[in-house]
Curated annotation (Swiss-Prot):
InterPro entries, alphabetized: GPCR_Rhodpsn, GPCR_Rhodpsn_7TM, Zinc-sensing_GPCR
Topological domains annotated Extracellular: 1-34, 90-109, 173-217, 306-323
Protein name listed in UniProt: G-protein coupled receptor 39
Cytoplasmic side: 56-69, 132-151, 243-283, 345-456
Biological role stated in the UniProt entry: Zinc-sensing receptor that can sense changes in extracellular Zn(2+), mediate Zn(2+) signal transmission, and participates in the regulation of numerous physiological processes including glucose homeostasis regulation, gastrointestinal mobility, hormone secretion and cell death. Activation by Zn(2+) in keratinocytes increases the intracellular concentration of Ca(2+) and activates the ERK/MAPK and PI3K/AKT signaling pathways leading to epithelial repair.
GO biological process: G protein-coupled receptor signaling pathway
Entry's Gene Ontology cellular component terms: plasma membrane
Subunit structure: Interacts with HTR1A. Interacts with GALR1.
Keyword Transferase in record: no
Entry-annotated residues carrying Phosphoserine: S397
Residues that bind Zn(2+): H17, H19
Length: 456
């Protein structure tokens, strides 16, 4: 077994304050990152704000259920809070002066706690939205018993309470400290470290930053590892629910194709519309899963690197990899909050249309009931036009068929009445008389035409 001090008894391979100038980022890279983050900030705030307005309009017009609207609004709010809390600190502390930024303990703790809370609120909102759609599609009867404003408030409350509990340990684990302070009761590298003013008197060091406290190392590790497990559980759960919903829609489609008759055909068209809306929701959720997996994974890897071993044991290669990963992980993490409005627009043409209308401050979306009435009137007009242009011989055959069917219906009615009431007076109405035609004629001509066309 090789000696741990083989690379050098002076710990030259281990990171030290003297190595800080080697990892300073060039000014042009800092300016580029600030401009990139500024674009992400503006697009994220604008996109999520417009998303809140669009969902409210769609609900008011009858195109979106209130349960889904509440989930989407809460998700957009958590994304906005991520930008408002994280970006200002990102601009100055992490990008411009990542290694020498002074900070206050209270602001460090509050920023870490609030940022973690809003980040995991976004993650858990995806879970609750997927769960709500999963129950609605795979267990519709249970959904009717569970759905309602009270249940939605409970789910949203669960999201924020759980995310608060996930972030709570950071209130105790984070603080302002010289990052290379020895962790108590931790067996580090067995080599001779150079002692300096920063390590011997960290409380007066001018290189103190907002980092995990050495005295709370176990709390910090538990918090990061626990949050990573929650991240994996959410990804697996949402992926499983999306797969189950796709299977349920596939079974529903096969059952509908086996239906016959006009009444069942009507149900088929109605369920096709609902399946289309549900399919759009599933597409959105699948895109969300892919986005979370891609955009959150670099940030999770960086966090795991920070919690894997204390900074006092970081080598120069380890620290260099961490600093290279830092801007990429932060960029992808904020993109995950920007991409939600884009996914809404990709997965729903109606959302895309209303989104553009809100940006132009010109809403022209009709109510859902009005749209259905217009389609029904257009269909009725087309049916009437087709019936006017039919050949006379076809119309005559329809009339004869209608007369024969009317006789059959009338005779069966007379027979049933005579059997039920033998003492009553027999029917005196002639089947071929005009009165008979007037009695048996339906009140709605469109309905009569529809029945005759179907049976002919």
């Amino acid at each position: 077994m090789a000696s741990p001090s083989r690379p050098g008894n002076d710990c030259s391979h281990v990171i030290d304050h003297s190595h800080v100038p080697e990892f300073e980022v060039a000014t042009w890279i800092k300016i580029t990152l600030i401009l990139l983050f500024l674009v992400i900030f503006v697009v994220g705030i604008l996109g999520n704000s417009v998303t809140i307005r669009v969902t409210q309009v769609l609900q008011k017009k009858g195109y979106l259920q209130k349960e889904v609207t509440d989930h989407m609004v809460s998700l957009a709010c958590s994304d906005i809070l991520v930008f408002l809390i994280g970006m200002p600190v990102e601009f100055y502390s992490i990008i411009w002066n990542p290694l020498t930024t002074p900070s206050y303990t209270v602001s460090c703790k509050l920023h870490s706690f609030l940022f973690e809370t809003c980040s995991y609120a976004t993650l858990l909102h995806v879970l609750t939205l997927s769960f709500e759609r999963y129950i609605a599609i795979c267990h519709p009867f249970r959904y009717k018993a569970m759905s309602g404003p009270c249940q939605v408030k409970l789910l949203i409350g669960f999201v924020w309470v759980t995310s608060t509990l996930v972030a709570l340990p950071l209130l105790f684990a984070m603080g302002v400290e010289y990052p290379l302070v020895d962790v108590p009761s931790h067996r580090g590298l067995s080599c001779n470290r150079s002692r300096n003013h920063h390590s011997e008197h960290p409380e007066t060091s001018n290189m103190s930053v907002c980092t995990n406290l050495s005295s709370r190392w176990t709390v910090f590790q538990s918090s990061i590892f626990g949050a990573f497990i929650i991240y994996l559980v959410v990804l697996v759960s949402v992926a499983f629910m999306c797969w189950s919903m796709m299977q349920a829609l596939q079974r529903s489609k096969q059952g509908t194709l086996a239906a016959k008759g006009q009444q069942l055909q009507l149900r088929k068209s109605e369920s096709e519309e609902s399946r289309s809306a549900r399919r759009q929701t599933i597409i959105f959720l699948r895109l969300i899963v892919v986005t979370l997996a891609i955009c959150w994974m670099p940030n999770q890897i960086r966090r795991m690197m920070a919690a894997a071993k204390p900074k006092q044991d970081w080598t120069k290669a380890y620290f260099k990899a961490y600093m290279i990963l830092l801007p990429f992980s932060d960029t992808f993490f904020y993109l995950s909050s920007v991409v939600n409005p884009l996914l809404y627009n990709v997965s729903s043409q109606q959302f895309r249309s209303v989104f553009a209308q809100v940006l132009r401050c010109r809403l022209t979306l009709p109510h859902a009931n009005q749209d259905k009435r217009l389609r029904a009137q257009a269909a009725s007009t087309m049916d009437s036009a087709r019936s006017v242009h039919r050949p006379l011989i076809f119309l005559a055959s329809r009339s004869n068929s209608s007369a024969r069917r009317t006789d059959k219906v009338f005779l069966s009615t007379s027979q049933s009445e005579s059997e039920a009431k033998p003492q009553s007076k027999p029917q005196l109405l002639n089947h071929e008389s005009p009165e008979s035609d007037s009695v048996m004629k339906p009140a709605n001509p469109a309905t009569e035409n529809g029945i005759q066309e179907h049976e002919v």
